[in-house]
């Protein structure tokens, strides 16, 4: 449309889902004017079902927290309403920043909502900082071990660690973290729980062969 009709981008197709009255099925709204409030779209679905944790604009991995009066923009594709956050009661928490998921600011925001005390911050060694401040994975899909980072979390006295890794990379966290007594949280947990989706922890199928990857088989709740 931008090329053929010389039409500016002022309409968006937006999906609203998760902790809503009437169930967690996806509600897709077509040709929504940019500037429409988040709250207006949520009300069109029937409203939020009781208590909730946060409203996220964007996807579970790279989205950000928003408010009911915030406007949708030309880059908005989804609005997600999460389950309430579990209360860590001030427990010491470590943050592992990966290029796959949220940046440090987003992870610290989630840690605050979990009521955890951030004690240690580590970065995946392949999440290299770029000139604009973002991070880019040097070798996507070929994940390094996270034993060193897990040891640093343990030495810092962390009870929990909050990760943002993809399902492949979370394997490397789960291979050693729980054995050290570290309790693993993923930055998407509050959103996955809202739709009954298994939590991202361990990839259970091989990446080496072609297969029909059923999400239910790829992750585990622990």
Tell me what each language-model feature is:
Residues 47-51, 56-93:
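Ubiquitin system architectures
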Residues 38-39, 103-105, 169-174:
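Short, well-ordered alpha-helical microsegments
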Residues 22-24, 63-67, 95, 103-106:
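Short acidic/glycine-rich loop or secondary-structure boundary segments that cap or lie
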């Amino acid at each position: 449309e931008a090329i053929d009709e010389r039409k500016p981008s002022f309409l968006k197709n937006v999906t609203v889902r998760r902790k809503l009255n009437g169930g967690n099925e996806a509600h897709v709204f077509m040709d929504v004017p940019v500037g429409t409030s988040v709250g207006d779209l949520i009300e069109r679905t029937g409203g939020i079902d009781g208590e909730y944790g946060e409203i996220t604009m964007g996807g579970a991995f790279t989205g950000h927290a928003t408010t009911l009066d915030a406007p949708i923009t030309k880059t908005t594709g989804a609005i997600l309403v999460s389950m309430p956050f579990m209360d860590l009661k001030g427990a010491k928490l470590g943050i592992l920043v990966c290029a796959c998921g949220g940046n440090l600011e987003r992870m610290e925001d989630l840690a605050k909502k979990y009521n955890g005390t951030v004690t240690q911050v580590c970065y995946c060694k392949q999440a290299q900082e770029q000139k604009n401040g973002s991070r880019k994975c040097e070798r996507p899909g070929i994940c390094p071990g996270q034993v060193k980072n897990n040891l640093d979390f343990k030495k810092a006295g962390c009870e929990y660690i909050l990760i943002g890794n993809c399902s492949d990379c979370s394997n490397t966290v789960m291979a050693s973290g729980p054995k050290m007594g570290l309790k693993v949280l993923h930055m998407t947990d509050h959103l996955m729980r809202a739709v009954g989706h298994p939590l991202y922890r361990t990839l259970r199928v091989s990446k080496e062969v072609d297969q029909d990857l059923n999400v239910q088989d790829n992750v585990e709740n622990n």
